[in-house]
Amino acid sequence: MGQKINPLGFRLGTTQSHHSLWFAQPKKYSEGLEEDKKIRDCIKNYVQKNIRISSGMEGIARIEIQKRIDLIQIIIYMGFPKLLIEDKPRRVEELQMNVQKELNCVNRKLNIAITRISNPYGDPNILAEFIAGQLKNRVSFRKAMKKAIELTEQANTKGIQVQIAGRIDGKEIARVEWIREGRVPLQTIEAKIDYCSYTVRTIYGVLGIKIWIFVDEE
């Protein structure tokens, strides 16, 4: 069988850049990694608890972390930043306090910025959340996939592949269903491909959603 490599890791350094930018001594590296995970989890939990759109989406595309000796700069890329900015700066300040408390960073300043992405449905993370929301509401998986593809077509992408695996529609035997529209050249390193894997809990069990979006050729 074909061995499938993660498309993002495969393209690191060519079309894909790192989401965390910092240097550390080899002994301290694991601490920095753990810190990054804490930051990302803390932000996602805050957004989950406080700001949910009616469809049950968080709308976070990615979180970038840049660290210096005295500063941690966090950039949150959101598809629907209105959710967080409506009663800004109170919300952002509260989020900043939460992250600071979680990290317990005394001698470092923390700065959070929110950036809007122009085509929310051109991002696989937001699209996966959309499909997850549909599946939770017991919409048939084919309908959810087709709707997701329609949304990406509006975002001017060159191709998309969606895969759902698990006990689809509550069937006894787990299976994998997928659909592709346009081109998705996974073997071409120069092709800029966005990828996301997402798990969703339904009443029948856990389903895995994978999305590949062919954005552009470098």
From Swiss-Prot:
GO biological process, one term: translation
Keyword GTP-binding: no
PROSITE patterns linked: KH_TYPE_2, RIBOSOMAL_S3
Keyword set, alphabetical order: Chloroplast, Plastid, Ribonucleoprotein, Ribosomal protein, RNA-binding, rRNA-binding
Molecular function (Gene Ontology), one example: rRNA binding
Chief place of localization: plastid
Domain KH type-2, chain residue ranges per copy: 47-118
Gene3D superfamilies: 3.30.300.20, Ribosomal protein S3, C-terminal domain
Subcellular location: Plastid, Chloroplast
A single GO cellular-component term on record: ribonucleoprotein complex
Presence of keyword rRNA-binding: yes
PANTHER family named among the record's database cross-references: 30S/40S RIBOSOMAL PROTEIN S3, SMALL RIBOSOMAL SUBUNIT PROTEIN US3C
HAMAP family: Ribosomal_uS3_B
Record text on subunit structure and interactions: Part of the 30S ribosomal subunit.
Family statement: Belongs to the universal ribosomal protein uS3 family.
Protein name as it appears in the record: Small ribosomal subunit protein uS3c
Lineage, uppermost ranks: Eukaryota, Viridiplantae, Streptophyta, Embryophyta, Tracheophyta
